């Protein structure tokens, strides 16, 4: 595996770009999708948009330790395929839903299917030589940022040109490609030698003040970053007074956030 680590890194990075683009390309027009396609009233759209947006992260956060444990016991490649297939299915379903309740259920499914990024990282750390691991993870992080930048712009453009439902199908197709690539081109990383761990190591880690403080800082930072995302499109519509191409402008606004993050990283 180590002889082909550059090819594996290239495939993983390309998958990360497609994954991030698929994640973010739907964000700019989700409020309009709820109102125009799913019949949500203007008075209720903020509530529905916030609930639909956040439920995926809630479920994903709860399931992350479980998927991580299964990756150690069942295999990292299997978890990557599971996440990719589940996300692809959820996006295809998102393109055919007709009610906000159905869309909420789709986002719940996305939460259960989360874990693709962590699976990519785990595979990279297992297959890339240790002396090249730092630069390899940096390249993958750059790919993640690139996908976050181009995703909203592509999603807003597709929604403008071909309709909002088309963007769901494109995202589903991208994630299907990722799943197939993992199935046929990424080898299963060798299992690490079992180590005797102390009882309840998570509890011991949380007893360290620096770990607790770091987790709090990360949680607050993520909360601030995600706070405006559910309402940014609605705010753009309010500023433009309903004139102009709201979905495209929202896509540009979200992409600029990614550009700023890349510059300051």
Name each model feature, range by range.
Residues 2-5, 187-216:
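Juxtamembrane intracellular "pre-TM" segments in multi-pass secondary transporters
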Residues 4-32, 36, 210-227:
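Pair of pore-lining "gating" transmembrane helices in MFS-fold secondary transporters
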Residues 29-46, 231-248:
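Short amphipathic helix-loop junctions that connect adjacent transmembrane helices
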Residues 51-67, 255-264:
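Central cavity-lining transmembrane alpha-helices of secondary-active solute carriers
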Residues 62-98:
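Conserved MFS/SLC helix-loop-helix module at the cytosolic interface between two early adjacent transmembrane helices
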Residues 90, 101-109:
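Paired small-residue
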Residues 106-144:
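Cytoplasmic helix-loop-helix junction between adjacent transmembrane helices
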Residues 173-192:
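C-terminal membrane-cytosol helix-exit motif in multi-pass small-molecule transporters
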């Amino acid at each position: 595996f180590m002889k082909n680590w550059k090819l594996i890194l290239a495939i993983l990075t390309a998958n990360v770009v497609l994954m991030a683009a698929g994640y973010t390309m739907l964000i700019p027009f989700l409020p309009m999708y709820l109102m125009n396609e799913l019949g949500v009233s203007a008075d209720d759209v903020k509530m529905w948009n916030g609930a639909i947006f956040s439920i995926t992260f809630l479920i994903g956060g709860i399931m992350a330790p479980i998927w991580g444990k299964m990756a150690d016991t069942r295999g990292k490649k299997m978890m990557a395929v599971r996440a990719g297939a589940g996300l692809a299915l959820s996006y295809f379903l998102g393109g055919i839903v007709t009610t906000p309740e159905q869309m909420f259920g789709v986002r719940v499914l996305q939460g259960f299917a989360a874990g693709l990024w962590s699976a990519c990282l785990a595979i990279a750390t297992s297959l890339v030589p240790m002396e090249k691991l730092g630069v390899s993870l940096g390249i993958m992080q750059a790919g993640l940022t690139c996908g976050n930048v181009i995703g909203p712009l592509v999603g807003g453009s597709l929604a403008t040109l071909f309709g909002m439902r088309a963007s769901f199908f494109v995202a589903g197709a991208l994630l299907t490609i990722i799943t197939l690539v993992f199935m046929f081109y990424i080898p299963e990383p060798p299992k690490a030698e079992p180590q005797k761990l102390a009882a309840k190591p998570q509890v011991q880690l949380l007893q360290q003040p620096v770990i607790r403080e770091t987790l709090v800082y990360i949680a607050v930072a993520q909360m601030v970053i995600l706070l405006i995302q559910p309402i940014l499109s609605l705010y753009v519509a309010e500023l433009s007074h309903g004139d102009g191409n709201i979905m495209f402008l929202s896509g540009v606004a979200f992409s600029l956030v990614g550009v700023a993050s890349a510059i300051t990283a």
